[in-house]
């Protein structure tokens, strides 16, 4: 009897669960960790990239993509599913510019993708998208926005959040480390995102992808040299804080 509920997408289990949606959320929990930080005038997205073969082109393994000049999406979960949502999101952004002659708002494109995900939880012959998305960018009024969508179709806005394998650990870190007066510059937001990823990433296996969006500027991907320099700064600050804490004792 339980297998029937597990295989059926549109049938609730006796305890009120849609098991296929929960299985999709489990696929997200097995994905690479992705973080997002909203600064005063920027948004930073960071992802822990999976290891790839030495023969594979590194540029083809991307966890962060542009939906429009002012919107970027990072994800955790199934890459093939993400490609479909990214394509749909890009087309919707272009269509909105063509029809209304202005850019989409962050809430609009987030709601569009969330509604698409929700439809796939009610249709026979389809399965839910096995990805969770962090959607960040700058609205036309210059305000930075950061949203998080789940496979079920729900979405929320955050100051800082995470998804993927170590999402709970990173969220706990953000709750302790994030404050508006400490994330006033682009550099502050980048360092906080990097600190969050370093909480769950081993230095010897570190492969990070970091994108920055600012008002009036295209999305900028940080190269490996810049990332390494910021990691050193973050590590030094962490050591100094640890020493200061010991001295207080």
Curated annotation (Swiss-Prot):
Its main location: cytoplasm. Transmembrane segments: none annotated. Changing residue 236 to K: In strain: CPA-46. SMART domains: Proteasome_A_N. GO terms for biological process: proteasome-mediated ubiquitin-dependent protein catabolic process. It comes from the Eukaryota. Testis specific. Keywords: Cytoplasm, Nucleus, Proteasome. GO terms for cellular component: cytoplasm; nucleus; proteasome core complex, alpha-subunit complex. InterPro entries: Ntn_hydrolases_N, Proteasome_alpha, Proteasome_alpha-type, Proteasome_asu_N, Proteasome_sua/b. It is found in: Cytoplasm; Nucleus. Signal peptide: none annotated. NCBIfam families: PRK03996.1. The proteasome is a multicatalytic proteinase complex which is characterized by its ability to cleave peptides with Arg, Phe, Tyr, Leu, and Glu adjacent to the leaving group at neutral or slightly basic pH. The proteasome has an ATP-dependent proteolytic activity. Belongs to the peptidase T1A family. PANTHER family: PROTEASOME SUBUNIT ALPHA/BETA. The 26S proteasome consists of a 20S proteasome core and two 19S regulatory subunits. The 20S proteasome core is composed of 28 subunits that are arranged in four stacked rings, resulting in a barrel-shaped structure. The two end rings are each formed by seven alpha subunits, and the two central rings are each formed by seven beta subunits. The catalytic chamber with the active sites is on the inside of the barrel. This is Proteasome subunit alpha type-7-1A. The lineage of its organism: Eukaryota, Metazoa, Ecdysozoa, Arthropoda, Hexapoda. The gene is Prosalpha4T1.
């Amino acid at each position: 009897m339980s297998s029937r509920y597990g295989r059926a997408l549109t049938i609730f289990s006796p305890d009120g669960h849609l098991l296929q949606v929960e299985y999709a959320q489990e696929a997200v929990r097995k994905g690479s960790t992705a973080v997002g930080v909203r600064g005063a005038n920027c948004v930073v997205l960071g992802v822990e990239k999976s290891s790839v073969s030495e023969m594979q082109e590194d540029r083809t393994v991307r966890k962060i993509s542009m939906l429009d000049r002012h919107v970027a999406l990072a994800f955790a979960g199934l890459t093939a599913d993400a490609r479909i949502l990214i394509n749909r999101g890009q087309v919707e952004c272009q269509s909105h510019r063509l029809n209304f002659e202005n850019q989409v708002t962050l809430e609009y494109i987030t709601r569009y993708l969330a509604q698409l995900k929700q439809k796939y939880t009610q249709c026979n012959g389809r399965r839910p998208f096995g990805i969770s998305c962090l959607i960040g960018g700058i609205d036309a009024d210059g305000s930075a926005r950061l949203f998080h969508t789940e496979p079920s179709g729900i979405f929320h806005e955050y100051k800082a959040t995470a998804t993927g394998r170590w999402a709970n650990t990173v969220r706990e870190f953000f709750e302790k480390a994030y404050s508006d007066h400490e994330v006033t510059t682009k550099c502050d937001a980048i360092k906080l995102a990097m600190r969050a990823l370093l909480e769950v990433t081993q230095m010897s296996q570190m492969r990070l992808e970091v994108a920055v969006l600012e008002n009036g500027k295209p999305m900028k991907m940080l190269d490996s040299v810049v990332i390494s320099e910021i990691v050193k700064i973050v590590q030094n600050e962490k050591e100094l804080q640890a020493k200061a804490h010991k001295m207080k004792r």
